[in-house]
Structure formats: C-alpha cells, structure tokens
Amino acid sequence: MNTQNNKTHKKTTSLNHKHSYRKLRRWVLPAVLGAALSTLAFLPTFAEDILSAPPTGNPPMSVPNGPVPKAEANPNTFTGTTVLTENKAIAHELISNTTSDQNAFIGKDKAVVTIENSVFDKTGNTTSDDNSNFRGQNAVILGIDGSQINIKGSNITSNSNGSNAVFATGEGSVINVENTNIHTKSDSSRGLDATYKGTVNGKNLTITTEGAHSATLATDRGEGTITAEAAKLTTSGEGSPIIYSTGNITADYITGEAKNSEIGVVEGKNSITLTNSNVTGYKDNGFMLYQSFSGDAESGIARLKAENNSLTTHATGAFIYVNNTTAEVDLTGNAISTPNTTTLVKAAADSRWGKTGENGGHLTLRASNQALNGNIVADAISTIALDMTNGSSLVGAINTDNTSKEITLKLSKDSTWTLTGDSYVKSLTNEDTTGDNIHLNGYKLVVADQ
C-alpha cells in the first residue's frame, strides 16, 4: 500500500520501484510452471509446501526466487490477545501482543466495542505480506465481520513489520478513532488502513510512521474508505506518502509531512479529497495518479480534489504526475509551492507500468480560483485538457517541445495565461475574444486547430 506491497503482472523493473514505493509484489510463475503445478493440485499439502525440484525441460524464462504465493487468509481465523465477539466497553486497559501473525485486539461478529483511555502495543513480524496488507493480520487493532470499534483517548503503537495500527476490512466493518496517538516504527505499518469496503474514521489524531511503505492514511485491495479530520500526520520511510488511495480517502484540516515520499498517490479508479490542509512532500512528485494493473485497484478514472490547501513539494519531479491511467484533478484556491521543479503537470508513459505504447497518461485538470506556476508537458501518447475558470492564472509554458499527443486549453474571460516559453496546443477556447487575457511575453503560441 501505500506504495505499499508488491503486485502481480509486473515486469522486474516495476518490482524494484514498487518495493521502494508501495507493496512487495507477489511473483507470478511462468505459464509453463503453472501447467506443471496443476498436476499436483490434488496433493493436500500443496498450499503449504514448496516444490523440492523443478519440472524437467527448459522453461522460457527463469523461475523467480521466493515461495509460491498463497491465497489470502480468512480474517475469521486470525487470533489475538483480545478477541471480542459481543458488545463491550473497555477503559484503562493495556493490551499488547508479541507473537507473529497475531493481533493485539480483534472485534468481530458485529460486536460494538467502546475503548477509552487504553494502550495498545504490537511486536512480532508478519510472515505474510498479503495477509497483513490486505486482511489486517498482525495489525494492532483489527475490525472484521461488521464490527464497530469506537476508540477515544488512547495510544496505539507497533514495532514490527506488517503491523498496521488501525485496520478495518470487510463491508460494514467500521472503526472510529478520536483523540488518539498512533506511532508505527517498522515497514508496511500504516496508520489508518481499510480494505474490502471497510471504513476507518479519524478525528483529532497524531499519526507518525517511520517504516517504508507506511502511509499515515491508506486503503488497499477491495477498496476501503478513510476519513481524517484535524490530524497531524508524519511519515519518514521510503515510499510512504501521507495518503495512498486504492479506495476513497478524505482529509480535512490536516497537517502532513512526507519526509521521503510524495504527498499523495491515487491508484486506479479511486480518489483523494483534500481540503483546508497544509501538507508537504519531499520526494519524486507532489501527487501521482497511476494504474499498476496489479489487481489491487480497479481500472477507471483516478481522481484528486484539492481545495483551500497549502500544497508544497520539494521533489524534482512534477507537482502532478499521471501515467498509465485516465485521471481528473480539481484544484480550487490552493497555495501551491514547487521550489525544486519547474514542471507543474506531466502526463507520460512510465516503463514500470502498463504495455509499451499504451501506458500514457490522460488528464483533465480543472482549475478554479487557482494560481498555477510551472510548465505543462505530455509525451507522444499522452493527453492533457486544462480548463481554467473563476479568475485562475497560469504562468508557464505548455508543450514547449511540441511533442505531446494532445494538449487543449479552455480559458474563462477572467482567467489569464502568461507564457514563459514557446507553447503548442491542439485547441484553445477563450471566452475573451480579444485575447487580452493571454500574455505572450515575447514567446510564440501555436494553436493547431486555428
């Protein structure tokens, strides 16, 4: 997640990135091995045994190292220090767990649990990245089976790989956490996490993660919903953005810092909505919207909506980077700072994901009452449609090398564009028929359709 673990159907080059980014993706055996393995399917121990010898003959490519991937576990089989299946109130408790693949606390069977002023701690590394990332095994607090867990005034910590702090999985499973401190120290250990239509709502939180692949707010396989309000969010690990969404994540009035990653990432047909917040990222790009085709996120339109925020990236990439997907971005009234890059928007293929020649980015960017500074670029298989309204402004060049497949621009009468370099667009729709809202500044503007 969070760039968080690995995904199937990826080239080796993408595996290296995803390891540093999100998930340790699972190896997919070549087709010739799949045929050989199918002959062993009747063996009762197949799901747990590793083949002792390879099949005869020469496969078309080398066999990846590592165990055969297993099916995700059923969360009902998970064990923990405290497992509640009925309604209960807990206060002033210390609940900890030190055993691998166990949870400190599990709520299940539609239990309604209230927890106040308690301490939860988890150590003991996961032995299954899939189970911990997708189903919440080894998390500190886990909600399943339509349970509702309400947490107030507590402390939640973990120091083991694959130990997410607060994890809800399965439709109807809801965790509400308020006035609570959360701190995870190891890899793949996110703050608030939801999968398979689970929901986590947070308010007045301090969340700190130190490990790689450990976003403070995250959703993963099967989608999930996260809301966060009035939270202080800090990540320091590689591939640990403040927000990583393969579901729907909404954050309001947060302060956030990703010391070794992007501000936010949207994968597939999912969304981030960010309002009234102050967030900063330091690596790669400001925001990335993409599709990995790993199976964790459905294909469709990736969406980012940001309104009334302070958005800062110290990265050298683009403020917004779109690849291998169709995306829609709405920017309204944000203060955007990009001190180390002149690239505002980039839509382009990325060799780590998708099929060569078909993995471009396709972005619709709507700006309302928004000041934009920087260049807009796209490669030969990518497109950008920029729509500026309500007094928006752009200071920058568009497609200055004239290499993009297509970039179009719409300007309302009260919006302006000041060129900083020669620019080439497919079409220009301007409500100001005099063109006085476009300042060439000595540069050339070429409109292909005119």
Regions found by a protein language model. Name each.
Residues 399-406, 419-430, 449:
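Surface-exposed loop/turn positions within long extracellular repeat scaffolds
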Residues 70-79, 99-106, 128-142, 160-168, ...:
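Extracellular beta-strand/beta-solenoid scaffold signature
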Residues 1-32:
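Bacterial Sec-dependent N-terminal signal peptides
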Residues 48-128, 445:
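N-terminal segments that cap or nucleate solenoid repeat domains
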Residues 441-450:
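Extracellular, surface-exposed repeat architectures
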Residues 84-92, 112-117, 148-153, 174-180, ...:
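All-beta strand scaffolds that present successive hydrophobic residues in beta-strands
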Residues 25-45:
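Sec-dependent N-terminal signal peptides of Gram-positive bacterial secreted proteins and lipoproteins
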Residues 90, 107-185, 193-202:
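Post-signal-peptide, soluble extracytosolic/periplasmic N-terminal scaffold domains
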